Amino acid sequence: MNKIELIELDEFNCGAGHIYSVAVDGADQTLYDLFLEENEGDYRAELGEIAHKLNTMSTWTGFTDIFFKLNEGKPGDGVCAITDLKGKLRLYCIRFGNILLVLGGGGPKSKLIRAYEEDPKLLSENLMIRAVSDAMAKAIREKDLTIEEDGSLSGNEIIELDNQ
């Protein structure tokens, strides 16, 4: 069983909502850090667009529907994706209303495929963020983790993933 730690990304927490990412099994880098590192060579402009969206949401708008490709997971799990304008790059995340966003990983989406399930990397990243969503839902139900009114998390921010 893997453990995940929810880590607040201070560079994006500017008043309209809180953004976290996930470190797996005590790793130094979060899934978002790895996403940036993996894509900085070929997708620098697209990463800039995604970072601009994250900054806009956390500073001004909150996490409203218009910024996301919704329903990227199971019904009701909050899993969605943020893309650049041309849809070349996809970042999976979990959205909790307009106040909390948990970033996972992602990668490039080829125009040759119709769905993430056709790409092993995107499928793997999607399944990981879905597992994080399930683990967070369980921790919230069991009162081990709380989403505060401002979107910050309190309680145990290290939780176990099932079946990973």
Residue ranges of predicted features:
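Basic, Lys/Arg-enriched alpha-helical interface segments
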Residues: 1-88, 111-164
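Active-site beta-strand-loop-beta-strand hairpin of nuclease catalytic cores
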Residues: 94-103
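Short acidic loop-to-beta-strand element that houses the catalytic metal-binding Asp/Glu
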Residues: 88-94
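A short acidic, glycine/proline-enriched capping/turn motif at secondary-structure boundaries
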Residues: 100, 109-110
